[in-house]
Amino acid sequence: MLQIELQKWIQRFSSTIRLFFRLLIRLKTIKVNTNNLVEQIYIVGPGSLNITLLTACFISMVFTMQIAKEFLYLDAASAIGAVIVIAFTRELSPVLTAVIIAGKIGSSFTAEIATMETTEQIDALYLLNTNPIDYLVFPKVASCFLMLPILSIISLTASIAISLFVAFVMYDIPSSVFLKSAFNALSISDFLICLEKSMFFAIIIGFISCQWGLTSNGGAKGVGNSTTSSVVTILFTVFITDFVLSYFMFQTTGSSIAQANNI
């Protein structure tokens, strides 16, 4: 049973890669449904803003409490802002946003397309001379690619603001000390890394969620299984991709805190 499931998963994942190249080949000739694209952009962007901000705020509160407490014990208050902002910019904001979108949007995309596949609506698109890649896949992938970096930046901004507030109110760390430490440690490349990671994650979420929906079978039960498997696969792939990107992006760089303090 496990072997059969593994074989099916490998087939689906390989078909996701093929879908990626099929879409690349069709980019120049693709027929974009503007209304559909705008609708998907709204679903991914403004439709996910509340949960993104809520998650960013509470995660930043907890993270700031843990970091500030330990660094104050080490008499390193001047490094608190740098550590928190670097962590959110390079890792936490893009990854947490991707996790939220995977759970909220990825599952929705898979369930929608899987239901269409089960009820033979995909076949109806072919009869209407409409390519499912143009009508279904491209708007969903494009909306993720456009909105996930924006959501990550919004999440990052909210996280920094909440961390600044918590550090000042709960631990009496002056805002000037926090911000000076943060801005001395940050560089433009850190923001670019945040955006680059978000773009990679957006592609993963878009293609896996769509392909898992297109390959769904087994009626209502199959829709549920495909949705669950889609989210698990997206998260698994996002975490592996994050590790690989971080390894190559930061392996040769020095300490940002040391550079900020001219050590």
From Swiss-Prot:
One Gene Ontology term of the molecular function aspect: phospholipid transporter activity
Family statement drawn from the similarity comment of this UniProt entry: Belongs to the MlaE permease family.
Annotated localization: Plastid, Chloroplast membrane
A GO cellular component entry from the record: ATP-binding cassette (ABC) transporter complex
Keywords from the UniProt entry: Chloroplast, Membrane, Plastid, Transmembrane, Transmembrane helix, Transport
Primary location: plastid
Family annotation (Pfam families): MlaE
Designated name of the protein: Probable ABC transporter permease protein ycf63
InterPro entries (UniProt xref): ABC_MlaE_roteobac (IPR003453), Permease_MalE (IPR030802)
Summary of the function given for this chain in its UniProt record: Could be part of an ABC transporter complex.
Transmembrane segments: 43-63, 70-89, 150-170, 188-208, 230-250
Entry membrane topology: Multi-pass membrane protein
Lineage: superkingdom: Eukaryota
